[in-house]
Amino acid sequence: MEEIQRYLQPDRSQQHNFLYPLIFQEYIYALAHDHGLNRNRSILLENPGYNNKLSFLIVKRLITRMYQQNHFLISTNDSNKNEFLGCNKSLYSQMISEGFAFIVEIPFSLRLISSLSSFEGKKIFKSHNLRSIHSTFPFLEDNFSHLNYVLDILIPYPVHLEILVQTLRYWVKDASSLHLLRFFLHEYWNLNSLITSKKPGYSFSKKKQRFFFFLYNSYVYECESTFVFLRNQSSHLRSTSFGALLERIYFYGKIERLIEVFAKDFQVTLCLFKDPFMHYVRYQGKSILASKGTFLLMNKWKFYLVNFWQCHFSLCFHTGRIHINQLSNHSRDFMGYLSSVRLNSSMVRSQMLENSFLINNAIKKFDTLVPIIPLIGSLAKANFCTVLGHPISKPVWSDLSDSDIIDRFGRICKNLFHYYSGSSKKKTLYRIKYILRLSCARTLARKHKSTVRAFLKRSGSELLEEFLTSEEQVLSLTFPRASSNLWGVYRSRIWYLDIFCINDLANYQ
């Protein structure tokens, strides 16, 4: 074990070779393959996306055969067949990518474990459930009192495979490992199969998500490195909430450090952004940067980011991918929410000797609303209602049992309430619940060849209870006669950490 720890030291990973020796060390494969080590609660071995059937010994043999193959014997007619493997090429490329991703994650995951253990003296487990989407929750709760403009940014996508390889050059000092990665990418994939940019964001092959997410996270980290550096230059940006809400933007943990070359190249430019007081968040392939100042200052921010990405990544980044919007009169589609800034008036009484004054302070906060029109469009597309929001029956579910029909409708309703629990006004959600409940009743009435009124009279409160959310169930059991408590809960915003993707109905196109 001492020999293993010597190779897995996080501090040594940037000074010595770690990928190439790991690939050809037998005990590393035993360490990765022995699932009895789950008792140590390792983040790597508890990752739910890890393939339990992956054999690292086969990965090692495939890498060796990949180097020893004769390229003149490869058939050019069949892109999915490879003679040196004698089997499906994509299957073995998937195994190599899984093994490569597992090994390359070891130093960064160990760094996260050490940072979690040192944070306030508490050891945090199950941190792999915290993702970059969870960083949007504190952003929506921020106070924007002094902010006037926002930058809506589309993160530039890598136009060549070499850019993905070069983003790792600061982390991986092993040239052999970079050559292996470059050879592997060019041998098994082309650019079109690696990344598609039809929508804002990125779409990866489901079979190789772990490997490509690692490459994409390393690339995004380089894109966001300027924000980390500027944050460290300002005392206003020192936040204490990063330890509680870790995100996977910076290799599964918040790394508040930037390579020295950036400080040398952009020290002169930083004088333009003294005391920026900025708020930043990223979701999917888009990001938002809010800062105080005038339109001229935000325009400087815009050209600074464009020049930074063009110089650092050697790619053509158009200024049209960054839009400057005024914070007070601009709403945006944010993770399925319709977000806009709301002004809350706060009256403060100040008394000085015999005189008293009333001071009215306007506080800017994000108002997260449920978009009713896109949601009704999603329900209409799924045949739950018409485009005008009138509930209709679901004929394709008529062959199911009554309990299955009620369970499906109730589960959709609960998932929507769960996802939109952070909404500041939930009146729209009750309209969605009404549509789903009446659509369920129409489907059951159609199945039993009865009217909706007769079916509801016969079923009683059984159908109503299936559409109660978890919060409503708890309050109904604790305070059966206090309906005002239920209204108080739904006026507040609740964020759940088990939300790690955008709801399908909320992602209506």
Swiss-Prot record:
Where it mainly occurs, coarsely classed, is: plastid
Give the record's keywords alphabetically: Chloroplast, mRNA processing, Plastid, RNA-binding, tRNA processing
Q: Where in the cell is it found?
A: Plastid, Chloroplast
Record carries keyword Thylakoid: no
Biological process terms in GO annotation: mRNA processing; RNA splicing; tRNA processing
GO MF annotations for this entry?
RNA binding
Q: Name one GO cellular component term.
A: chloroplast
Q: Which residues form a coiled coil?
A: none
Tell me any Pfam family this protein matches. Intron_maturas2
**What domain of life is recorded for the organism?**
Eukaryota
* Signal peptide bounds: none
Q: What does this protein do?
A: Usually encoded in the trnK tRNA gene intron. Probably assists in splicing its own and other chloroplast group II introns.
What the record says about family reads: Belongs to the intron maturase 2 family. MatK subfamily.
Protein's name according to its UniProt entry: Maturase K
Q: Which organism is it from?
A: Nicotiana tomentosiformis (Tobacco)
| Name of the encoding gene | matK
